[in-house]
């Protein structure tokens, strides 16, 4: 199952981008044998004054046809890392070829796009900067693959 992290805004060179690259490289290595990956980041333009509706249109265009859509949203479901790993495995086992993990801009996900999504995931009750959400999501993908592979990265 190919993973597409689709996010508003361009991440400049720096520690966040380096961390994302590191975690997605690790995910590619550990996920391959599990039928997960590769994962890639797709960035859409951050239209400062365009509003969430315009961002949603750009995000929709970046989502592959037929992909399962999971939005990152503070109102979404909070899951443990093992539960998220099992959810990924379940989607993979359903034969889903593509998973779009969608991250909105500073104002979040447009309500209409949220309603269209197959799933809404929250990384906790706190609100996180959308640029950091990418790093946290990339790490959780790697952690999920490690859990599914029985590797010692995740500790209960």
Curated annotation (Swiss-Prot):
One Gene Ontology term of the molecular function aspect: rRNA (pseudouridine-N3-)-methyltransferase activity
Positions bound to S-adenosyl-L-methionine: 72, 104, 123-128
Pfam families: SPOUT_MTase
Record key words, sorted: Cytoplasm, Methyltransferase, rRNA processing, S-adenosyl-L-methionine, Transferase
Keyword presence, Transmembrane: no
A cellular-component GO term for this protein: cytoplasm
Subunit and partners: Homodimer.
Family label: Belongs to the RNA methyltransferase RlmH family.
Name assigned to this protein: Ribosomal RNA large subunit methyltransferase H
Encoding gene (name): rlmH
């Amino acid at each position: 199952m190919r993973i597409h992290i689709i996010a508003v805004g361009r991440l400049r060179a720096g520690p966040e981008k380096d961390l994302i690259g590191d975690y997605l490289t690790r995910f590619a290595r550990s996920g391959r044998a599990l039928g997960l990956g590769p994962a890639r980041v797709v960035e859409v333009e951050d239209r400062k004054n365009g509003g969430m509706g315009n961002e949603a249109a750009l995000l929709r265009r970046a989502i592959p046809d037929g992909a399962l859509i999971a939005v990152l949203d503070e109102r979404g479901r909070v899951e443990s890392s093992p539960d998220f790993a099992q959810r990924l495995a379940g989607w993979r086992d359903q034969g889903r070829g593509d998973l779009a993990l969608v991250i909105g801009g500073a104002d979040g996900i447009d309500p209409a796009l949220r309603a269209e999504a197959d799933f809404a995931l929250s990384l906790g009750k706190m609100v996180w900067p959308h640029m950091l959400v990418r790093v946290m999501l990339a790490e959780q993908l790697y952690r999920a693959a490690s859990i599914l592979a029985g590797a010692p990265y995740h500790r209960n």
